[in-house]
Design a protein with these regions (language model features):
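Ligand-binding pockets and gating/stacking loops
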Residues: 1-419
Length: 419
């Protein structure tokens, strides 16, 4: 199938209805394809294991080999499939997961790997997954930001990739730090609603006059930012995890990742289209086994709690959960007891809507040095994410009259993973 030209079943009407906030956004034509109406809104939760989790200590253990490390492999709820003993709770719900053991990104670099992971591209300037999904799943009654990224306070660098590219400011990720509400959501008591409404009318009229004869995109960017802030002020309670029960705080874990996932659940329940939660400190160039015991203990418990809650609330069937870092870690153990960057053979997982649960796709060789079968590229995963969410990944953006594929046309969805 020609991924660029395959458009059967879609009417030509405005897919991009929102104002854009960058110069390039002015070139997005309304002549693009609308997504089909869905009975329930699809949502995306990206659990990002920042730094690159070791596949040997998580999804693809190699016990008893020179690359395997000290940990055992344990049985799971999928007969014949084993994962690391560092994920004992996850082993009990493997029948809910879709695991890919054959990712070959060949990008052993944090920043480049993170961008390629999120955009499915190696060329800069394309929207990352959260921004693309926020746009492509946008509904007329959405008023909250479509993409919210949650992280702890700390190093930024590659962890803050959230570029909407040519989609504009409306689809940039809103960043939440330490599960706290964005600053200044509470209006001063002296500001009365009737005054705010009057100021809004004056502002919009002034904007319209100012835009005459000028490039309107920078002005639109300010307006979009203002409207998003106004929407957040009206729904500031969705960020307040103190409203969650003490037992929920305990179940999710008192660490940053646990509390941030608790907030993510609230945001998804409130209708946010895409939420990303970053779990830090997987970049174990030294003392890899010590650090993975700590990180896996946090991740294991919180992941299972979150998936169970989403399932019990009937949300998992409409939410795609993606669990991945930007790379894997070397089979070789260095002289500091660490594992270094590795992009040639690593693992990730998914759960929820649109993917087949209880399967393991692809494999690596005995030492985990190379992909043995069913190699997967990051572009393939990007197509697969979109398809799982009910989005035709062969659609095009239309920019200045030229088509620009939503997903890399050199890649394709992994049909065997799709439900």
């Amino acid at each position: 199938m020609n991924l660029i030209s395959s458009r059967i079943g879609f009417s030509r009407r405005a897919l991009f209805t929102g104002a854009a906030g960058s110069l390039a956004a002015s070139s997005i034509s309304n002549e693009v394809f609308a997504k089909p109406v869905k009975p329930k809104k699809k949502q995306l939760l990206l659990l990002f294991l920042s730094g690159g989790a070791s596949q040997f200590e998580t999804w693809d253990p190699k016990p008893g080999t020179k690359t395997g490390g000290p940990f055992r492999a344990i049985s799971t709820s999928i007969p014949g499939v084993k994962i690391s003993e560092l994920l004992p709770q996850t082993s009990k719900i493997m029948h809910r997961l879709t695991v890919v053991r054959s990712v070959n990104s060949n990008i052993p670099d944090h920043f480049l790997g993170h961008y390629a992971l999120q955009s499915g591209r190696s060329v800069p300037g394309y929207p990352v997954l959260g921004s693309a999904v926020a746009k492509l799943l946008e509904q007329p009654d959405d008023f909250l930001p479509g993409y919210i990224s949650i992280r702890r306070d700390g190093p930024k660098a590659y962890t803050d990739v959230g570029d909407a590219g040519f989609l504009g400011a409306k689809y940039e990720g809103v960043r939440i730090v330490n599960n706290q509400s964005p600053e200044n959501l509470i209006a001063p008591l002296s500001v009365k609603p009737e005054i705010t409404n009057l100021v809004d009318r004056v502002r919009m009229a002034t904007d319209q006059r100012f835009k005459m004869g000028r490039n309107s995109n920078p002005i639109a960017s300010y307006g979009i930012t203002y409207n998003q802030a106004d929407a957040l002020m009206k729904r500031k309670e969705i960020f307040d995890i103190s409203k969650e029960s003490q037992s929920d705080h305990d179940r999710y874990g008192k660490h940053d990742f646990g509390q941030n996932c608790l907030l993510a659940k609230r945001l998804l329940q409130s209708g946010v289209t895409c939420v990303k939660v970053t779990h830090f400190d997987w970049d174990a160039h030294q003392d890899n086994f010590y650090w993975h015991q700590i990180r896996c203990a946090e991740f294991d418990r919180t992941l299972v709690t979150l998936l169970n809650d989403l399932s019990e609330k009937g949300m998992l069937e409409n939410t795609l959960v993606v669990i991945t870092g930007e790379m894997g870690r070397t089979p070789q153990i260095n002289n500091l007891g660490g594992r270094d960057h590795w992009g040639r053979a690593w693992s990730m997982a998914m759960a929820g809507c649109g993917v087949k649960p209880g399967i393991v796709y692809g494999s690596t060789n005995e030492l985990g040095t190379e992909v043995k079968d069913n190699p997967v590229k990051l572009g393939d995963l990007f197509h697969t994410y979109l398809r799982a969410l009910g989005i035709d990944s062969s659609l095009d953006y239309n920019i200045n009259g030229q088509t620009n594929p939503i997903a890399d046309p050199a890649a394709k969805p992994i049909d065997l993973l799709l439900a």
